[in-house]
Amino acid sequence: VDWSAVDVVHAELGGGRLAEFQALRALQRRFPKLPLTATVHDPERLVWRREKLPWPLSIASGMRSPLPEMATVLADPLCLHEERQLARHMTRLVTLTQAGSQSLRQRMGLKPAQMEVISHGNMDIAPAPLPPMKPLRLLYFGFIYRGKGIEDLLDALASVFTEKPALRSTVRLTLAGGSEPEMAFGPSGSYLEQLRLRIRQLGLVDLIDWQLDLPAEQIPQVIQAHHVMVLPYRESSKLKVLGKLRGTSGALSWAVACGRGVITSDARSFAEEVSHGNGMIYPQGDVQGLADALVNVCTHPERIAQWAEKASLMGRARVWSHTAERFQSVFRQACEVH
């Protein structure tokens, strides 16, 4: 590549995106005047871990858990130093939310002029009317693996039917999305089978629908066949040792694009994403709080239409063509700075 002919470089950074991180570091060292920009998907950090642990911590890499995890924590000050070193030389860093921008700026020690917020872009999807209100159709959409809080959603739904048995015949839940084998199978066996067992134990078999490994072209149709998306995410307790994750969610962006409201935990930056009248939040891990939110939407169905209307407005404002214009402006400003 003839880097003298390049006006600006842009990268996508997130947890584990180490090739892009190392490429930016190399470019910064070799071409210190070249404008560098990046979208940071998982603030308050850039990549959260090093590609390789330094010696002698590297000895622990091939050992049994928890030794590799302990080594990662011990090496984190070095990783954080490298992240800050690069971040402070970046011309512009884009985050998807204000909360993400603030957390990244504070943790990396950045100047306000380096920061830009551009909401998660989405496809321009034709609006579709809400389906008939009975039954109320809830949707979990996203990868189906441990740590997504799906058990909380199942427990909350069972709690709703215990407290208000009359609602049982009026609500259905669909679990839709990808089930990557390496994520769905762990040391304790198949996660999908564990979910199915839990569903049987809770007496919910007749109320749960499955849409696994959904083809991309069917996503809008499936989302719009439901009333509300439910995202019960929990933040990783292991990750908290390294920092606060303040990213957002592709699933939440799909809900916005398809004009559907969301009930979500307050994990990540979700509270900001549903602060536009397009849904409601509850404290992550609070099963009773989620159950209360579900009862709320069952007993106040008019909110579903209100949320859908607000989500549709957001979706139209966030179409990729508008997002591209925002990035074009960022790139132009980055070139002017240098």
Positions of PLM-derived features:
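Nucleotide-activated donor-binding/catalytic signature segment of Leloir-type glycosyltransferases, i.e.
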Residues: 187-220
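Conserved acidic donor-binding segment of nucleotide-sugar-dependent glycosyltransferases
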Residues: 276, 280-287, 295-302, 316
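Membrane-proximal helix-turn-helix segments that form the acceptor-binding/catalytic region
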Residues: 29-30, 56-93
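Short acidic/histidine- and often glycine-rich active-site loop of Leloir-type glycosyltransferases
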Residues: 257, 266-281
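A short, well-ordered alpha-helix in the C-terminal region of glycosyltransferases
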Residues: 296, 303-317, 329
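Helix-loop-beta element that forms the nucleotide-linked donor phosphate-binding surface
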Residues: 85-95, 101-122
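Conserved donor-binding/catalytic core segment of Leloir-type glycosyltransferases
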Residues: 131-148, 154-157, 173-176
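Acidic donor-binding loop of glycosyltransferase active sites
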Residues: 224-246, 260
